[in-house]
């Protein structure tokens, strides 16, 4: 068992050079720890809704240097391969004759997305305000809301929503957007 610093540079400040290491290029670090079964975990103390191997996007560099005085180890790590962050959603819905969509959405947030979801929930005044924000954002009505692992120190959150949503209808036609819920609302590459 050991722990050590992994020194790196934020994504917005450039990469660490291979050929001429320089302390001036270092501007941040995360802690690496190895358990008895040789599994390495990485921790960042700067985020409030973090977990083992869940690092903020700005630290997901492809070149970070492990520096260990006790083991005399120095090696490169790709921190962008440490965690798997994703949102998996399964929607099962029925279109009713009146043009409404009634269904259930099961979502699993993992990694950074679980942290963002926790942060969003903590920012809401209470659970009613959180549900109202969800309804307003995607223009639907939540009939039942259930969630697991909200308070746990866990890299995943499971969410189950029973919902109804009104589709656009004219005299004889019902117009349905196949994207019942927005998968992206803002461009993440815009600053």
Model segments located where?
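Single conserved hydrophobic/aromatic residue that forms the stacking wall/gate
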Residues: 2-6
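A sensor for short, sequence-defined functional sites
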Residues: 7-191
């Amino acid at each position: 068992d050991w722990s050590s610093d992994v020194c790196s540079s934020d994504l917005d400040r450039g990469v660490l050079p291979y050929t001429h290491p320089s302390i001036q290029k270092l501007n941040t670090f995360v802690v690496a720890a190895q358990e008895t079964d040789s599994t390495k975990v990485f921790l960042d103390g700067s985020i409030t809704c973090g977990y083992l191997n869940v690092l903020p996007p700005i630290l997901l560099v492809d070149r970070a240097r492990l520096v260990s005085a006790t083991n005399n180890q120095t090696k490169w790590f790709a921190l962008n391969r440490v965690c798997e962050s994703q949102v998996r959603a399964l929607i099962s819905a029925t279109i009713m004759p009146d043009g409404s969509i009634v269904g259930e959405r099961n979502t699993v947030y993992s990694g950074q997305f679980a942290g963002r979801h926790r942060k969003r929930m903590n920012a809401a005044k209470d659970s009613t305000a959180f549900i109202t924000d969800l309804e307003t954002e995607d223009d639907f009505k939540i009939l039942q809301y259930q969630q697991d692992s909200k308070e746990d120190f866990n890299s995943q959150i499971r969410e189950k929503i029973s919902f109804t949503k009104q589709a656009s209808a004219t005299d004889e036609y019902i117009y349905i957007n196949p994207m019942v819920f927005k998968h992206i609302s803002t461009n993440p590459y815009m600053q």
